[in-house]
Structure formats: C-alpha cells, structure tokens
C-alpha cells in the first residue's frame, strides 16, 4: 500500500485528483490518511459485504465497476452500500476484454443499468481510440475511465494491448 503515497503526491502536483480501488477493508485506514476523495470497487468485489460497508461508511463517493457482475450482484452491492449510508454511487459499465472491440462494448447496457437501478453511470473504456468514451459521455456517462499505457513493451497482456495515448 505504501506505493500509493508517492503516486497521490505526484498526481496532485500535476493538478490531478488521485483515487484508488480498494480490495480489503483493512486497506481503507491507510488510504484515508492520504485524503483519498473517492473510491472504486471492482466488479469481483460485489459480494464482499465487509468491503462494501466499510467503504460506504467513509462517506466518500464510490465508483462501482460492473464489468464482471450479474444484475443480482449489482443489486446486492447497492443494497449493502445504501444500508451503510453510501454517498454518491456511480455504476461503471465495462467490457472486460483488452482491447475491447467497438462492437462489443454495448453502451446501451450502461444506460440500462442506470435506469434499472436509478443511479449515475460511467464507462470504463478498454477500446482503442476515443469514439467509445465520447459516445458514452453523449449518452449520459458522468465518469470515464480510460485504460492506457505510456510503454507497451513490458511483458504483460494488458500492456501489449493498451493504447499509448488517451
């Protein structure tokens, strides 16, 4: 967790707002000392009730990724977050492939989950280029997460497939 401090500092020096994904409630105490203004919870954590409750109790906005979650899991996570007085929640639509072909992202699903759960929506973009995030914004996304790398040479599946520019 110590690697967060220099990253948060560097982001702030550049006028950015740093935040992080949390995977364990025990990590929140440390991350809170950094003044993290918002948290992201990965889709595979939708049934980790302790993490959901503890994150909600910070009173900070939460970005809830839905990429690998089922509708019942999303509903469950929202019930836990609401029960624990979560602040603003953004449901982040995601196609969990790298890179994601434009034809696979189904941005209608983004608006559908927003309507179904009466929540703000965003889009986690794994496509190449800017068409998908611009379209998502036009369709009502209030948050866009764009995956990219500044160096595609590391031996890693995601690094080899990510664009080098946002």
What are these regions (language model features)?
Residues 1-13, 54-59, 111-117, 160:
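Alpha-helix-loop-beta-strand connector modules within alpha/beta enzyme cores
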Residues 31, 65, 91, 140:
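Conserved, mostly hydrophobic/aromatic
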Residues 30, 72-77, 129-139:
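Catalytic cores of alpha/beta
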Residues 1-44:
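Active-site beta->alpha loop and helix N-cap motifs at the rims of alpha/beta catalytic domains
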Residues 158-164:
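Conserved small/polar residues in nucleotide/adenosyl-binding loops
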Residues 41-58, 71-76, 100-109:
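Active-site-adjacent beta->alpha loops and helix N-cap segments on the catalytic face
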Residues 64-74, 121-130:
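Active-site glycine- and acidic-residue-rich loops that bind
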Residues 30, 89-131:
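Active-site/ligand-binding-proximal alpha/beta "capping" segment
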């Amino acid at each position: 967790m110590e690697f967060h401090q220099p990253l948060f500092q560097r982001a702030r020096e550049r006028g950015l707002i740093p935040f992080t994904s949390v995977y364990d409630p025990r990590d929140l105490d440390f991350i809170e000392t950094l003044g993290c203004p918002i948290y992201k919870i990965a889709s595979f954590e939708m049934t980790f009730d302790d993490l959901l409750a503890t994150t909600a109790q910070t009173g900070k906005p939460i970005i809830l990724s839905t990429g690998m979650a089922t509708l019942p899991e999303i509903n469950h996570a929202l019930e836990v977050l609401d029960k624990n007085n979560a602040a603003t929640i953004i449901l982040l639509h995601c196609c969990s492939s790298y890179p994601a072909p434009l034809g696979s992202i189904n941005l209608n699903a983004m608006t559908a989950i927003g309507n179904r759960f009466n929540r703000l929506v965003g889009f986690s973009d794994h496509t190449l280029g800017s068409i998908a995030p611009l379209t998502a914004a036009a369709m009502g996304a209030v948050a866009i997460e764009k995956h990219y790398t500044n160096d595609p040479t590391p031996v890693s599946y995601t690094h080899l497939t990510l664009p080098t520019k946002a």
